[in-house]
UniProtKB/Swiss-Prot annotation:
Domain of life: Eukaryota
GO CC annotation: chloroplast; mitochondrion
Family, as annotated: Belongs to the TRAFAC class translation factor GTPase superfamily. Classic translation factor GTPase family. EF-Tu/EF-1A subfamily.
Originating species: Glycine max
Region entry G4, spans: 206-209
Compartment list: Plastid, Chloroplast
Function: This protein promotes the GTP-dependent binding of aminoacyl-tRNA to the A-site of ribosomes during protein biosynthesis.
Region (G3): 151-154
Gene it is expressed from: TUFB1
Name of protein: Elongation factor Tu, chloroplastic
Region (G2) residue spans: 130-134
Transit peptide stretch: 1-70
Amino acid sequence: MAISWAAATTSKLAYPPHVHFSPSPSSNYLFLKTHKPSATHLSSSFIHPTTILHLAAANTTTRRRSFTVRAARGKFERKKPHVNIGTIGHVDHGKTTLTAALTMALASLGNSAPKKYDEIDAAPEERARGITINTATVEYETENRHYAHVDCPGHADYVKNMITGAAQMDGAILVVSGADGPMPQTKEHILLAKQVGVPNIVVFLNKQDQVDDEELLQLVELEVRELLSKYEFPGDDVPIISGSALLSLEALMANPSIKRGENQWVDKIYELMEAVDDYIPIPQRQTELPFLLAIEDVFTITGRGTVATGRVERGTIRVGETVDIVGVKDTRNTTVTGVEMFQKILDEALAGDNVGLLLRGIQKTDIQRGMVLAKPGTITPHTKFSAIVYVLKKEEGGRHSPFFSGYRPQFYMRTTDVTGKVTEIMNDKDEESKMVMPGDRVKLVVELIVPVACEQGMRFAIREGGKTVGAGVIQSIIE
């Protein structure tokens, strides 16, 4: 079942203890991080950098970061269709190295700004451990498309942050080491991609240079195809390109103007992006529906006001239009005074764009992750709803035991997770039931502890103890 949700780990604002919020990929477009851990400082223009932001992880202490904000460099020209993709896969299989190689290879064609590995893996804690904790975002272009690329963490502690990145992808590049084959997080990321509704996957078999036997690489390819088919992706049809992200990156760093045909490993990167261009379709954006953006992060810019960042889920937004801020607190109204993406000013943000919106008269304390910005009157906050829920089996990574009425897990809805209580359980025939077994499909009535902007047909995930235990869709709003 495809679900859209984002994860939560730690909070930067003084949130109530029952609502948890986590770092966002789209905010990464907005603010350039510096490495001194000090009080937050923002300069006075409203803008967009392209590197990683802050660190927040399930098992780590969040440090204060200082942020600087860069002036917008001109206007964003919408010449090519925009697609959100990202790298997923097991820790140390080469996701961040591949992301760096992609930006450098396309920069050599004049289609992107090159990003070095340590610009993508920028948080000090990440570089110390050599792993990506936050979801980092870069932009690049092929001949046909403009891409926003999210580099997702692979380390088990940080799967929640990976969810945040995956929830906004139109397609993913699954990175698997040809030397090791699929590993535990490879499987978990494929499952999560399915759950959050990532529609298409292209595979990059990395570290080909470390595999002496061609047959071994073919076995790994077969194993990956079987794994994708197991999680209901078309395993037999998925494009699989093998190569070496590290050797291509080294070649590009030695000669940034390298041309196609001059290095076999760099050519593999171009081959991968051709597969992505061909295989991952341009998504149909819901531009005709009323505007809605789920807030992923909030910043204050001295002298200008408060910026909310996130991905436009549907509709369009222009400077001067009014929006409702809905969820968690009382609904209030504000005017959008600026719209930007990738350090460039936009006339209009469309569904699918990751943007920053400057809001008039709003303090940072008035607004937080998990709220939504929406066209006035189109969505309201609720605390009680009925939903059809599929409870994952033990083999799917779910619970090992049943749960009963009164069960209190976390409900992941768009960019928030909030504690909710299961107050009623009904079976397929609408008869009251006492318990729910892993693998059951049931109707539940859920009561949330804070109001959240939700609507009929909205998908959510249920998580408990660091794992996904169920997936559902709201059938009706009760209150």
